[in-house]
Design a protein with these regions (language model features):
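Short coil/turn linking the two alpha-helices of tandem helical-hairpin repeats
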Residues: 122-131, 173, 194-206, 454-457
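Conserved, well-structured interaction surfaces
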Residues: 12-13, 17-30, 52-127, 143-157, ...
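Long, intrinsically disordered, low-complexity segments
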Residues: 67, 80-83, 157-159, 240-311, ...
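Alpha-helical solenoid repeat scaffolds, predominantly canonical TPR units
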Residues: 86, 154, 161, 211-214, ...
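C-terminal substrate/ligand-recognition segments
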Residues: 331-470
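An aromatic- and glycine-enriched ligand-binding surface/loop that stacks and positions planar moieties
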Residues: 1-53, 163, 185-188, 193-382
Length: 563
């Protein structure tokens, strides 16, 4: 209304609620569900590479031409600071709000504290020691001098905020239908994650041990209080990412929500596109057509926004005993047309099969395509098309230069979306509605294990027990004993292997490699298609737009390697 000011609007409970809700909006509207974070956080590491090793988003995923002027670098910076600014505005005003329900004040205080810590964790890990802002800012106030803050000060604020979230957030969201709100389990998880990351900025072992204790205590609390916190592991890997469990996922500790009602999303016709970003090309091959079961492979071509697993990632799994691989990756496509398919010369040539197979028939429901991590003998003479690991990748792990084979690979299934079929939308629709799980319970087990491995006087038997808790859940039925590992495996490198098997594609890998100081080592060892990797890539550049807007850009400075 005319004459309204933020102070007047936010003093009313309805206005304040709108401010709190706005702090959530960008997580789905800009980050978790969109391509930038896929490129920034799944890309740039050892587990994923652009489909066909193409150049889409190469600045983020392969560090090619990564400069301070790249749009995604600017947008990520701006949106994270906007979230922080909303949180600062709310935290500054919360005690002036006329709440009808007094307990709501503490809950919203916890949510704003959680959101600010979560945003700063992303911001600091992506860009380094940036400007610490705890007061609401305007464009005018930022057109002045800005100064870098120390990692100590930045992490002190994050840890304080995370602890405030722990102290104030309820077990259930408030109101209970708002499943995307931060709750107690999310607060403990964030405290554990932030404290573990804080270790990487410590000089002495004694200082590291201080933060290992905070991280382990928070993670172990979640493990010990699953019933009270309303979180638990599914019995099998297949259940974790079953689309039927997406909106009520019992293993999720924090989710970024996307509504099945398009108009409720920040970008109504463009909400969650994750279902498009990990598919291999299958339609129009060997008689296959695009359908709901196998998903939208529109992006599965060179030059598009899609990611394929590295050879290293695929070879981390022993699918004979580890059920995660077949639960979370698709290799086989069965003919999905009502009529049989007869092989044609052009399709035989495409898959390098003998012309003598012209006219041979694949019946509906029979295997038409197999894109596999295995090596298949006599693969060209099988009645269906085979692209095996040696077709898709070279021996050194790089992506094949064959345009016929480098768009065919095992497809990640963690983001399959039932919204299209449920709504009767076309199979090539982009409008996904899945929630994106950004924190899952197994992370707490890995944090406890890592702390016991790395802290002074740690107990590797405890680490082994926590890792085996997750590996037993991951086992093929009857293979639980074979999946268990011994104390000799309790190293940081094994933790990173196990995190890769459990969390591939879930936006964690770049953070994990950076936190452990392994980014350059692992990329050089396992992803030869990122030859430009350098130590300074553990930070992205400070946006030129920001430096141009302040009075002391030289004093603030660009991150090393980007001048």
């Amino acid at each position: 209304p005319a004459g309204s000011t933020p102070d007047n609007v936010y003093k009313e409970q309805a206005g304040f609620e709108a401010l709190v809700n706005s702090a959530y909006a960008f997580w789905g509207g800009q980050f978790y569900g969109r391509e930038d974070f896929v490129l920034l956080l799944n890309g740039g590491g050892d587990l994923w590479i652009n489909i066909a090793n193409c150049g889409y988003g190469r600045q983020m995923s392969k560090y090619e031409e990564l400069t301070a002027s790249v749009g995604q670098i600017k947008n990520t910076w701006n949106r994270l600071y906007e979230i922080i600014n909303d949180c600062n505005a709310g935290l500054e005003r919360i005690d002036q709000v006329e709440f009808k329900d007094k307990k709501l004040r503490d809950i919203r205080f916890g949510e704003l504290s959680f959101m600010r810590a979560y945003a700063y964790w992303h911001l600091v890990e992506i860009y380094g020691n940036v400007d610490l802002r705890t007061k609401e800012t305007s464009a005018e106030s930022l057109s002045m001098n800005c100064y870098r803050s120390s990692y100590e000060d930045l992490y002190d604020l994050m840890l304080t905020d995370a602890q405030n979230a722990v102290d104030n957030l309820p077990v259930d969201p408030y109101p209970v239908k708002d499943v995307g709100r931060a709750t107690s389990k999310a607060a403990y998880g964030l405290l554990a994650r932030i404290a573990l990351t804080r270790v990487s900025y410590c000089d002495s072992q004694a200082d590291k041990d201080k933060y290992y204790k905070i991280a382990e205590d928070a993670a172990q609390y979640v493990i010990d209080n699953q019933s009270a916190l309303k979180v638990s592991l599914y019995n099998t890997p297949a259940e974790v990412f079953d689309p039927d469990n997406n909106k009520t996922n019992k293993e999720a500790m924090f989710v970024v929500t996307h509504s099945t009602e398009s108009s409720l999303n920040m970008q109504a016709k463009n909400p969650n596109r994750m279902h498009m970003y990990f598919h291999a090309s299958y339609s129009a091959r060997a008689g296959m057509v695009q359908d709901y079961e196998y998903g939208n492979d529109k992006n599965a071509k060179s030059g598009s926004m899609a990611m394929m697993p590295t050879r290293y990632l695929l070879e981390l799994y022993n699918e004979n005993i580890d059920a995660r691989y077949n639960a979370w990756f698709r290799e086989e496509y069965k003919l999905n047309t009502p009529k049989a398919y007869a092989w044609t010369k052009d399709q035989l040539d495409y898959f390098e099969k003998p012309s003598s197979m012209i006219g041979q028939v694949i019946q509906p429901g029979e295997t038409a395509l197999l894109f596999t991590k295995k090596k298949i003998a006599d693969k060209r003479n099988l009645p269906y098309a085979v692209v095996d690991i040696d077709d898709t990748y070279a021996a050194d792990g790089s992506v094949s230069k064959s345009a016929n084979f480098n768009i065919h690979f095992p497809t990640l299934l963690k983001y399959e979306d039932a919204n299209f079929e449920n709504k009767g939308l076309p199979t090539n629709s982009q409008v996904g509605a899945n929630d994106v799980i950004t924190m899952r319970l197994p992370e707490m087990y890995f944090i406890v294990a890592e702390c016991e491995i790395m802290k002074s006087g740690g107990n590797k038997e405890i680490a082994k027990a926590r890792i085996n808790d997750i590996r037993r859940r991951a086992a093929v039925p009857g293979k639980e004993a074979e999946m268990e590992v011994g104390v000799d495996k309790m190293t940081i490198d094994f933790i990173l292997e196990e995190r890769a098997r459990e969390y591939c594609g879930e936006f964690m890998r770049w953070f994990d490699l950076k936190r452990t100081g392994k980014l350059v080592e692992y990329v050089k060892a396992h992803n030869p298609d990122i030859p430009l990797i350098q130590p300074h890539h553990a930070w992205r550049p400070i946006p030129q737009m920001f430096l141009d807007s302040i009075l002391n850009p030289d004093e603030f400075g660009q991150n090393e390697g980007y001048n």
